[in-house]
Structures are given as C-alpha cells and as structure tokens.
C-alpha cells in the first residue's frame, strides 16, 4: 500500500503522551526534571503527613513516584464506624478525587486510598488537601452509628463504590 499522508490520532490516551513530549521539548531536560522533582517533593510531603495521622499506615515507606497509597491501621479499622470509602465521599464533597479501592487478587482484603500528585499541584494545595482529610476524619469520628460501607464490611458483603473496586468483597482486618 502506498501511504502518502499520515497524521497522529489524538485520542485521549495519546493526547497525554503527546502533551508530555511537548512539555519535554518546551522545557528541556532540566526543566522537565524540575517539574517532576517538584511533584515528587509534594508527594513525599503529603505521604509523610498522612503517615503521622493516627488512623493511617502508608503502604510503603518510600515515595519514588509522585503517587502513593495508604490504608487504615488494622487496630483502628476494627473500632472505626467508617471506612476509607466514606473518607473518599467526604473528600469528593470538597472537590478532591482521592479514590478508595481494594487491591487486586490475593490482596483484596486491603482497602486503600491513592494520591497522585500532578504537575502544578502546589504546597498550598497539599495543605488544603491535608486539612480536608483531617476535617473529614474529625466528622467521621463523631458518628454515632456505623456507615453503610462499614456495615457491609462487617458482614463481608460487596461494597458499592463510585471507583473501580476489582469486583471483590472487602474483608475486615
């Protein structure tokens, strides 16, 4: 076949990759490195601050990419009237997209939350997110009765979430 003309298909997934190439060319290696370093620095800051919060454990001790996950401490989760799904809902009321979901097969007992720090996410925004997490925890700890997601976990029933959940049941730890 004779192909005389070709053009890139800028569907959504390809657009992100092309955008990264453009940024790399525009900023140069050093500029792009600084952008990534800033994202990583903010991710490490949020990771460390979440690790200091009583209910949480970070899944890993180190942050090597501008993303990380955490989960409820098992001893905290046993007594809590809420789950990370409830925290996800509270944060979404303030405009944050911090998903809670189960890990894949053989780790599906863990419900985790994930933060991905994107380019342009500032230290001020990180402080706002951390403040909203702390406020949401304070509200959730005042509950008199368990939330529906907490009751579903207690009964080992599937939890309906707004985020992908690997189709697994959640188990209490």
Where are these regions (language model features)?
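Substrate-binding rim/cap in mid-to-C-terminal beta-strand-loop elements of soluble/periplasmic
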Residues: 20-22
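Mobile "lid/hinge" segments at catalytic clefts and subdomain interfaces of large enzymes
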Residues: 15-17
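Alpha-helix capping and helix-loop boundary segments enriched in small/acidic/polar residues
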Residues: 7-11, 37
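Conserved core segment of the aminotransferase class I/II
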Residues: 1-7, 25
């Amino acid at each position: 076949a004779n192909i005389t003309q070709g053009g890139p298909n800028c569907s959504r997934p390809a657009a992100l990759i092309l955008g990264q190439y453009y940024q790399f060319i525009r900023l140069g290696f050093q500029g792009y490195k600084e952008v990534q370093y800033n994202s990583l620095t903010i991710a490490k800051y949020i990771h460390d601050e979440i690790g200091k919060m009583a209910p949480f454990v970070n899944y890993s001790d180190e942050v090597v990419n501008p993303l990380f996950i955490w989960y409820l401490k098992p001893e905290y989760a046993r007594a809590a009237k809420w789950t990370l799904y409830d925290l996800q809902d509270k944060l979404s009321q303030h405009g944050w997209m911090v998903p809670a979901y189960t890990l894949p097969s053989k780790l599906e007992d863990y419900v985790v939350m994930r933060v991905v720090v994107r380019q342009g996410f500032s230290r001020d925004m990180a402080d706002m997110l951390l403040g909203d997490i702390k406020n949401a925890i304070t509200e959730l700890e005042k509950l008199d009765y368990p939330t529906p997601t907490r009751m579903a976990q207690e009964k080992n029933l599937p939890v309906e979430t707004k985020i992908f959940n690997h189709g697994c049941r959640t188990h209490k730890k």
